A protein has these predicted regions:
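Aromatic- and histidine-enriched alpha-helix N-cap/loop-to-helix transition segments
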Residues: 3-4, 96
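Helix-loop segments that flank and shape redox-cofactor active sites
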Residues: 4-27, 82, 86-87
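Amphipathic alpha-helical coiled-coil segments
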Residues: 38-43, 103-112
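Acidic/histidine-rich alpha-helical segments that form the ligand environment
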Residues: 55-109
Length: 112
């Protein structure tokens, strides 16, 4: 899911004519990979190896804000299914991921 977000935002970043949008999306796709890696390593340290990761494909949408908002909803639904609430180190990384999404959404909605 996070790799898909990186691909969609990078593609949009390359095709936008808005400098503010270009910069916001650049920050997102650079940051999301670092956070995905950080989460995967910590998760595997606690639970063991994840195994093969299947790559998702994006639903057709021309609106990157809607795409990111949909991903936030999906992440909210999954967070306690993937990691128990009491595992605060991993939940903190998930919170960092949400922080990146929300910061990017702010920049796209109000600054771009």
């Amino acid at each position: 899911m996070l790799f898909l977000a990186r691909d969609v935002t990078h593609s949009t970043h390359l095709n936008t004519r808005s400098y503010a949008k270009h910069v916001a999306l650049n920050e997102f796709y650079d940051g999301i990979i670092d956070l995905a890696d950080k989460f995967a390593e910590a998760y595997q340290g606690k639970y063991g190896l994840i195994g093969p990761i299947s790559l998702m494909s994006a639903k057709k949408t021309g609106n990157v804000v809607e795409f990111l908002e949909d991903q936030v909803e999906e992440l909210m639904e999954m967070r306690y299914k993937v990691v128990e609430k009491e595992c605060t180190p991993l939940q903190n990384i998930i919170d960092e991921i949400f922080g990146l999404y929300y910061s990017t959404l702010y920049k796209l909605k109000f600054l771009a």
